[in-house]
Amino acid sequence: MPFMHGSMPLRRTFFYLQQGKVKLRDNVNVFSMGFHKNPTPEQSGARDFVYWNWAQLQYHNPKVQLVKHADKVVTPFARAYLNDGREVLFDLDGMKREEIEKLLAKTLGKTELVERREHLESIAKLNPADFGSKNERQCMCEVQGQHPCTGLLRAPQCVTGKYRWNHNLI
């Protein structure tokens, strides 16, 4: 397989995808980037950013549409379309991959406070499979298709735990 040579498999690992630093805000709908596949040395930062960071952008921003414009532009650029109809345009000519990453994280990215809050909310989110007084469902019998409570209906003798079919075991 041609994509499994060189640095290609590294970019597909789960650990590498989690290392992405650009987590776009919720008001970003579309993010597009124009670059050259065979750039001049001043324009190579945009191509390198797409090569190394595009998969991380897709992983961390599943609700954002990401568009690449390869070899269709004169100078490399990035453009973000926001919810309210505004556009944010970045000129990436002469910037390196790390500079582009910092620029996008600072202007379009979530702040550390927002990221920390979302992380704590995801931890505290109640699991719908949990049962008990602090959860949505009090008992397993409230789920459709499950056995009713033994308080409402007598359980079969083989389910109660008091029934032993082989008395010679003990």
From Swiss-Prot:
GO annotation, cellular component aspect: mitochondrial small ribosomal subunit; mitochondrion
Coarse class of the protein's main subcellular location: mitochondrion
Pfam families, sorted: L51_S25_CI-B8
Location of the protein in the cell: Mitochondrion
GO molecular function annotations of the record: structural constituent of ribosome
Keywords: Mitochondrion, Ribonucleoprotein, Ribosomal protein
Gene3D superfamilies: Glutaredoxin (3.40.30.10)
Superkingdom of source: Eukaryota
Subunit record text: Component of the mitochondrial ribosome small subunit (28S) which comprises a 12S rRNA and about 30 distinct proteins.
Family (UniProt): Belongs to the mitochondrion-specific ribosomal protein mS25 family.
Protein name: Small ribosomal subunit protein mS25
Species of origin: Caenorhabditis elegans
